[in-house]
From Swiss-Prot:
The gene is E2. Belongs to the papillomaviridae E2 protein family. Residues 197-228 have a biased composition (Polar residues). InterPro entries: E2/EBNA1_C_sf, Nucleotide-bd_a/b_plait_sf, Papillomavirus_E2_C, PPV_E2_N, Reg_prot_E2, Regulatory_protein_E2_N, Regulatory_protein_E2_N_1, Regulatory_protein_E2_N_2. GO terms for cellular component: host cell nucleus. Residues 197-304 are annotated as: Disordered. This is Regulatory protein E2. GO terms for biological process: DNA replication; DNA-templated transcription; regulation of DNA replication; viral DNA genome replication. GO terms for molecular function: DNA binding; DNA-binding transcription factor activity; nucleotide binding. HAMAP family: PPV_E2. Its main location: host cell.
Length: 398
């Protein structure tokens, strides 16, 4: 008990020293998060031993200390990567590397030099919202390299321009107007520029995407929001064919799935349907039929051979949808801990609009499996963050 008290006193003394030092060195910020992790590990150990108080400090619950320790580990990993990049030599304060700033929009990025802008709805100064435009945004791209960008504002929202010229919106003015405005009209003033959208019905569908709230060509910023919506609706008919979607998986405990009937394929006669003891006859599939099914074969009432043949038509996948940095962290974790539970995994990617390079929707990542059993095993083992959607599907070919 006394040794735990002494250890806690030492950790908190080191933290106070860092706070008073007010260092701008990223190494000190990494040290701070390491000390916070050690503090939570100590609390976790004490609680497991039934200790409810260390000195004057109340020991938090096991869940609380575990969650805070994981947060500290995550921040340490992000900051260590940033330190090893070309931006590690810049000045980094405690505020710059705080969890609150890291999760502020755009989330999972480091930010500096915040400036507040105001969006006024219905030309009523009392009906407004405020958002932050950042002078510097540090984000990771698809190959985990750190990049630096700056926020900007247009009539559609607040965004930052990525290194490949793609606008990544993190505030959608039209979506906000649909929530707070009676008329759908809003006005934004930023650095001497004034943006006002044209009148649009409040109950019309917002152009809501993670990457780009408008999904329209930047050259059409002066056009009406309603016209932009028509462009999006028209463009949606020409999106590339997506993997066949079956259903979303709820978070937490897996939901049992009832068997589905499988339609009879070309080349399958009555022999493929008949099953008479050991003399079961099955029709083998042609190479052209591989990967063409979009249904899961029934799990019961058939031999393993028949199931394998049916699965050959249906290479199963899952599509993970969420924030790009969240997906990158998840990919790193499952490659390190669950490499035997999947066949291959993609990099993060986005749909883009058919008229321009603006990104459409959340980031996505595909995981491919050799069988539905392997996919089920993967979903049973891997804990997916609540903010990441899981969609089951299949490729039209492998």
């Amino acid at each position: 008990m006394e040794s735990l008290n002494n250890r806690l006193d030492w950790l908190q003394e080191q933290l106070l020293t860092l706070y008073e030092k007010d260092s701008k060195d990223i190494e000190d910020q990494i040290m701070q998060w390491n000390l916070l992790r050690q503090e939570q590990v100590l609390f976790h150990y004490a609680r497991k031993k039934g200790i409810m108080r260390l000195g004057l400090q109340v020991v938090p619950s096991l869940a609380a200390s575990q969650d805070k320790a994981k947060t500290a580990i995550e921040m340490t990993l992000y900051l260590s990567g940033l330190r090893d990049s070309q931006y590690g030599s810049e000045q980094w304060s405690l505020q710059d590397t705080s969890r609150e700033i890291f999760l502020a929009p755009p989330d999972h990025t480091f930010k500096k030099g915040g400036q507040t802008i105001e969006v006024i709805y219905d030309e009523d100064p009392n009906n407004s919202t405020r958002h932050t435009v950042w002078r510097h945004i540090y984000y990771q791209n698809g190959d985990n390299r750190w990049r630096k960008a700056a926020s900007d504002v247009d009539v559609h929202g607040v965004f930052y321009l990525e290194y490949d010229g793609v606008k990544n919106y993190y505030v959608d003015f039209q979506e906000e107007a649909n929530r707070y405005s009676k008329t759908g009209r809003y006005t934004v003033q930023y650095e001497g520029k004034r943006f006002t959208n044209v009148m649009s019905p409040v109950n019309s569908s917002p152009l809501r995407t993670s990457g780009s709230p408008t999904d329209t060509n930047p050259a059409t910023q002066g056009q009406s929001t309603q016209t932009a919506r028509k462009a999006e609706t028209k463009g949606s008919r020409h999106h590339p064919k997506s993997p066949a979607v079956r259903k979303r998986r709820p978070y937490g405990r897996r939901r049992s799935r009832s068997p589905r009937d499988t339609t009879l394929r070309r080349g399958e006669g009555e022999s493929a349907r008949a099953s008479a003891g050991s003399g079961e006859r099955v029709a083998f599939i042609s190479p052209g039929d591989v990967g063409t099914s979009t249904r899961s074969p029934p799990k019961g009432g058939q031999s393993r051979l028949r199931r394998l043949i049916q699965e050959a038509r249906d290479p199963p996948i899952i599509c993970l949808k969420g924030g790009p940095n969240q997906l990158k962290c998840l990919r790193y974790r499952i490659k390190a801990s669950n490499s035997s539970d999947f066949e291959s995994i993609s990099t993060t990617w986005h749909w883009v609009h058919n008229k321009c390079t603006d990104r459409v929707g959340h980031a996505r990542m595909l995981v491919r499996f050799i069988s539905t059993e392997q996919r089920d095993r993967f979903l049973d083992k891997v804990v997916v963050p609540k903010s990441v959607s899981v969609i089951l599907g299949a490729f039209d070919g492998s």
